[in-house]
Amino acid sequence: MGEIWYFALPVPHNTSSKPIEITKVAVVHVPSGIKVLEYGAYDLNDTEGLPLLAKEGESYTPEFAKLKNYAEKPVKVPAGESSDIFYMAKVKITAPPKETVRKCRFEYEQGGRAYVQTLDCELELKVAE
């Protein structure tokens, strides 16, 4: 217990013909035993690719605290492109989780209108007995 993990949300891809600005992200279903500490947004080039799941302190885990966090302002995604910025949920295991973390919500604006989209995503963390 007490382990901290970084869980990558789906990389934003704008399939529309107009740019979007992502204003907020969140994991929708967080079971008991897991606590979301914070969300961050990082450049894929700074992390040498997408770390889907990484444990804090491991040699292969990017040092997110030393990287630029783009979550402080809306992240722009051009029309018809994938973002170079991806979102991470920093989570802590507080008790043995009985369910998975699932569903990722993105809030964004396009052409002055606000939208919400929920995507499938899932994370299962287990605690050694």
What are these regions (language model features)?
Residues 1-129:
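Non-catalytic macromolecular-recognition regions in eukaryotic signaling proteins
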